[in-house]
């Protein structure tokens, strides 16, 4: 394993020939998948700096997605080793990982797909209370990106990450989002809940959907006054009887009844 990392890690560079970095990243991901935790512990101090260095400067989407999956695997298989690592300047790995997340959130939406979501949740699960000092900024960044997201993969990824935090830290998350104002004056909580209730059922993976349902239950139990007057789309309203509708026209016409957000949560549950 160490020899393979010695071969692949130097290829994670923006200076190598086109196609080399994504190939090396894919190989690293494949090796991490089949390696057991004990083997991975021996290469964290060598592999993590190479992976992190590329992710802080690299632009290749394919390479970045493979490396996000690699980091998720490291977080799951040897969390104490990766979170306990420091660089030569005594910078903790968590600080480096948060810089990576910040950079990825500033990049094109196609970078923030399923691999990004799995990386985020794996890190959230293992870092736990270590994230407390940066949670306000992290939540703000995630919801701000969600507010601008147009691609389904990016939207569902951000919703999944936020749902995980809601499911496991509901009281703190609700309080922080309610106190965070986004551009335009709307609270981050209202923005998140509106988008969440609109798109959550597009989730098709059973375990992710279960996480969403757990999170929605937690949200309902921590309902706040700021959500009392939030109305969202409910059922599709029937077309007027006097209008002849073709299939395409009916789809374009679709209008929804407006229902309280709390009612929509109960319907989803």
Task: Identify the role of each PLM range.
Residues 1-269:
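Karyopherin-beta/Importin-beta family HEAT-repeat alpha-solenoid scaffold
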């Amino acid at each position: 394993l160490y020899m393979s990392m010695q071969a692949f890690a130097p290829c994670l560079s923006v200076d190598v020939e086109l196609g080399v970095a994504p190939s090396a990243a894919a190989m690293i991901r494949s090796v991490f998948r089949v390696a057991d935790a004990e083997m991975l512990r021996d290469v964290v101090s060598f592999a993590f700096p190479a992976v992190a260095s590329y992710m802080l400067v690299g632009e290749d989407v394919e390479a970045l997605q493979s490396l996000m999956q690699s980091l998720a695997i490291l977080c799951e298989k040897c969390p104490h080793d990766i979170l306990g690592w420091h660089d030569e300047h005594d910078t903790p790995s968590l600080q480096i990982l948060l810089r990576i997340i910040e950079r990825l959130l500033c990049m094109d939406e196609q970078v923030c797909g399923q691999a990004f979501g799995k990386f985020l949740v794996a890190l959230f699960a293992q870092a736990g209370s270590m994230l407390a000092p940066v949670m306000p900024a992290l939540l703000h960044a995630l919801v701000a990106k969600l507010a601008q997201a147009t691609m389904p993969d990016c939207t569902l990824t951000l919703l999944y990450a936020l749902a995980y935090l809601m499911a496991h830290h509901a009281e703190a998350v609700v309080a922080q989002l309610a106190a965070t104002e986004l551009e335009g004056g709307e609270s981050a909580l209202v923005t998140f809940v509106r988008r969440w209730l609109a798109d959550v059922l597009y989730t098709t993976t059973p375990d992710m959907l279960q996480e969403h349902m757990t999170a929605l239950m937690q949200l309902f139990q921590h309902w706040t006054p700021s959500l009392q007057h939030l109305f969202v789309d409910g059922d599709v309203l029937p077309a007027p009887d006097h209008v002849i509708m073709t299939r395409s026209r009916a789809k374009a016409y679709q209008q929804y009844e407006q229902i309280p957000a709390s009612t929509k949560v109960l319907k989803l549950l």
